Amino acid sequence: MTTPTIDEMRQNRLAYHFSGDCLRDGRPLPAIGEMLMHDGPIVWCEAGLYWSRKPHQALLYAPGPMLSLVRVGGTIIEPDYEDKGASTERTVLARIDATHLLRRFAADQALSVAHLWDMPEVVREYLTALDESKRDAARDAVRAAAWAARDAADAAARDATEAAARAVRDAAWADFDARVHAVLPAREHFQ
Protein backbone atom coordinates (compact mmCIF):
# COMPACT_ATOMS: atom_id res chain seq x y z
CA MET A 1 0.00 0.00 0.00
CA THR A 2 1.38 3.40 -0.94
CA THR A 3 1.20 6.38 1.37
CA PRO A 4 -1.24 8.97 0.03
CA THR A 5 0.17 12.36 -0.85
CA ILE A 6 -0.95 15.53 0.92
CA ASP A 7 -2.84 16.53 -2.24
CA GLU A 8 -4.66 13.19 -2.27
CA MET A 9 -5.46 13.59 1.43
CA ARG A 10 -6.84 17.10 0.80
CA GLN A 11 -8.80 16.05 -2.27
CA ASN A 12 -10.46 13.25 -0.30
CA ARG A 13 -10.70 15.44 2.84
CA LEU A 14 -8.80 12.79 4.83
CA ALA A 15 -6.72 13.44 7.91
CA TYR A 16 -5.51 11.83 11.15
CA HIS A 17 -6.44 12.49 14.75
CA PHE A 18 -5.01 11.08 17.99
CA SER A 19 -7.01 10.83 21.19
CA GLY A 20 -6.98 9.12 24.54
CA ASP A 21 -9.81 6.99 25.90
CA CYS A 22 -12.13 9.97 25.47
CA LEU A 23 -12.15 13.33 23.73
CA ARG A 24 -10.39 16.31 25.33
CA ASP A 25 -13.72 17.68 26.53
CA GLY A 26 -14.49 14.38 28.27
CA ARG A 27 -17.04 13.05 25.78
CA PRO A 28 -16.66 9.41 24.73
CA LEU A 29 -14.88 8.66 21.46
CA PRO A 30 -17.30 8.71 18.55
CA ALA A 31 -18.17 5.40 16.92
CA ILE A 32 -16.79 4.56 13.49
CA GLY A 33 -18.89 6.49 10.97
CA GLU A 34 -20.14 9.01 13.53
CA MET A 35 -19.70 12.68 12.66
CA LEU A 36 -18.63 15.16 15.29
CA MET A 37 -19.83 18.70 14.73
CA HIS A 38 -18.46 21.92 16.18
CA ASP A 39 -21.06 24.63 16.66
CA GLY A 40 -19.72 28.14 16.36
CA PRO A 41 -16.73 29.65 14.67
CA ILE A 42 -13.31 28.05 14.55
CA VAL A 43 -10.92 29.92 16.82
CA TRP A 44 -7.38 28.77 16.02
CA CYS A 45 -5.89 26.71 18.86
CA GLU A 46 -9.01 27.23 20.95
CA ALA A 47 -12.19 26.04 19.25
CA GLY A 48 -12.84 23.60 16.43
CA LEU A 49 -12.18 19.98 15.54
CA TYR A 50 -8.46 19.53 14.92
CA TRP A 51 -6.56 17.03 12.78
CA SER A 52 -3.38 16.65 10.73
CA ARG A 53 -2.73 15.42 7.20
CA LYS A 54 0.10 13.11 8.29
CA PRO A 55 0.11 10.74 11.28
CA HIS A 56 3.45 12.03 12.59
CA GLN A 57 2.07 15.57 12.61
CA ALA A 58 -0.99 14.46 14.57
CA LEU A 59 1.32 12.74 17.04
CA LEU A 60 2.64 16.15 18.15
CA TYR A 61 -0.79 16.87 19.64
CA ALA A 62 -1.59 13.34 20.87
CA PRO A 63 -3.17 13.11 24.32
CA GLY A 64 -3.23 9.32 23.94
CA PRO A 65 -2.52 6.39 21.60
CA MET A 66 -5.87 6.09 19.79
CA LEU A 67 -5.24 7.00 16.13
CA SER A 68 -8.19 7.70 13.86
CA LEU A 69 -8.40 8.19 10.12
CA VAL A 70 -10.99 10.93 9.70
CA ARG A 71 -12.85 12.75 6.96
CA VAL A 72 -13.13 16.48 7.58
CA GLY A 73 -15.86 18.76 6.36
CA GLY A 74 -17.90 21.87 6.94
CA THR A 75 -15.75 24.93 7.40
CA ILE A 76 -12.09 23.93 7.00
CA ILE A 77 -9.10 26.04 8.00
CA GLU A 78 -5.69 24.70 7.00
CA PRO A 79 -2.91 27.30 7.00
CA ASP A 80 0.05 26.41 4.78
CA TYR A 81 2.53 27.05 7.60
CA GLU A 82 0.80 24.75 10.09
CA ASP A 83 1.03 21.01 10.68
CA LYS A 84 -2.63 20.84 11.61
CA GLY A 85 -6.00 21.99 10.44
CA ALA A 86 -9.38 22.63 12.00
CA SER A 87 -12.89 22.03 10.79
CA THR A 88 -16.48 22.11 11.97
CA GLU A 89 -17.04 18.45 11.01
CA ARG A 90 -14.91 15.36 11.61
CA THR A 91 -16.05 11.82 10.88
CA VAL A 92 -14.11 8.79 12.11
CA LEU A 93 -13.52 6.32 9.26
CA ALA A 94 -11.21 3.92 11.13
CA ARG A 95 -9.45 3.75 14.49
CA ILE A 96 -6.58 1.76 15.98
CA ASP A 97 -4.87 1.63 19.33
CA ALA A 98 -1.41 2.67 18.13
CA THR A 99 0.39 1.88 21.39
CA HIS A 100 2.37 -1.07 20.01
CA LEU A 101 2.97 0.69 16.68
CA LEU A 102 4.39 3.75 18.48
CA ARG A 103 6.59 1.67 20.79
CA ARG A 104 7.89 -0.47 17.92
CA PHE A 105 8.65 2.66 15.87
CA ALA A 106 10.45 4.33 18.79
CA ALA A 107 12.44 1.14 19.47
CA ASP A 108 13.42 0.82 15.81
CA GLN A 109 14.60 4.44 15.78
CA ALA A 110 16.68 3.82 18.90
CA LEU A 111 18.16 0.66 17.37
CA SER A 112 19.02 2.58 14.19
CA VAL A 113 21.51 4.68 16.17
CA ALA A 114 22.75 1.90 18.46
CA HIS A 115 26.12 1.96 16.70
CA LEU A 116 26.70 5.50 17.98
CA TRP A 117 27.05 4.49 21.61
CA ASP A 118 27.95 1.55 23.82
CA MET A 119 24.39 0.27 24.23
CA PRO A 120 23.96 -2.05 27.23
CA GLU A 121 22.82 -5.52 26.19
CA VAL A 122 19.64 -5.35 28.29
CA VAL A 123 18.64 -2.19 26.39
CA ARG A 124 19.22 -3.90 23.04
CA GLU A 125 17.22 -6.92 24.20
CA TYR A 126 14.31 -4.74 25.31
CA LEU A 127 14.32 -2.67 22.11
CA THR A 128 14.47 -5.77 19.94
CA ALA A 129 11.72 -7.79 21.64
CA LEU A 130 9.83 -5.07 23.55
CA ASP A 131 9.78 -7.57 26.41
CA GLU A 132 8.07 -5.69 29.25
CA SER A 133 9.92 -7.81 31.83
CA LYS A 134 13.15 -6.11 30.69
CA ARG A 135 11.75 -2.59 30.51
CA ASP A 136 12.75 -1.43 34.02
CA ALA A 137 16.26 -2.87 33.71
CA ALA A 138 16.66 -1.22 30.29
CA ARG A 139 15.45 2.12 31.67
CA ASP A 140 17.91 1.86 34.58
CA ALA A 141 20.78 1.00 32.21
CA VAL A 142 19.99 3.92 29.92
CA ARG A 143 19.78 6.31 32.87
CA ALA A 144 23.10 5.06 34.21
CA ALA A 145 24.70 5.51 30.78
CA ALA A 146 23.22 9.00 30.45
CA TRP A 147 24.52 10.03 33.89
CA ALA A 148 27.94 8.58 33.07
CA ALA A 149 28.02 10.50 29.78
CA ARG A 150 26.96 13.69 31.56
CA ASP A 151 29.63 13.20 34.22
CA ALA A 152 32.28 12.57 31.54
CA ALA A 153 31.20 15.69 29.64
CA ASP A 154 31.25 17.73 32.85
CA ALA A 155 34.74 16.45 33.68
CA ALA A 156 36.00 17.22 30.17
CA ALA A 157 34.51 20.72 30.31
CA ARG A 158 35.99 21.29 33.77
CA ASP A 159 39.43 20.08 32.60
CA ALA A 160 39.27 22.32 29.52
CA THR A 161 38.20 25.30 31.62
CA GLU A 162 41.00 24.73 34.13
CA ALA A 163 43.58 24.34 31.33
CA ALA A 164 42.39 27.56 29.70
CA ALA A 165 42.52 29.38 33.02
CA ARG A 166 46.08 28.14 33.62
CA ALA A 167 47.11 29.25 30.12
CA VAL A 168 45.62 32.72 30.64
CA ARG A 169 47.25 33.01 34.07
CA ASP A 170 50.64 31.86 32.74
CA ALA A 171 50.43 34.28 29.80
CA ALA A 172 49.49 37.16 32.10
CA TRP A 173 52.40 36.47 34.46
CA ALA A 174 54.78 36.07 31.52
CA ASP A 175 53.64 39.47 30.28
CA PHE A 176 54.19 40.97 33.74
CA ASP A 177 57.64 39.42 33.96
CA ALA A 178 58.54 40.84 30.53
CA ARG A 179 57.43 44.31 31.60
CA VAL A 180 59.50 44.10 34.78
CA HIS A 181 62.57 43.01 32.84
CA ALA A 182 62.06 45.87 30.40
CA VAL A 183 62.37 48.51 33.11
CA LEU A 184 64.90 46.94 35.49
CA PRO A 185 68.56 46.45 34.74
CA ALA A 186 69.53 42.99 33.58
CA ARG A 187 70.12 40.37 36.27
CA GLU A 188 73.74 39.88 35.34
CA HIS A 189 74.56 43.34 36.70
CA PHE A 190 73.69 42.18 40.22
CA GLN A 191 75.73 39.02 40.42
What residues fall within each predicted segment?
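Short, glycine-biased loop/turn motifs at secondary-structure junctions and
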Residues: M1-Q191
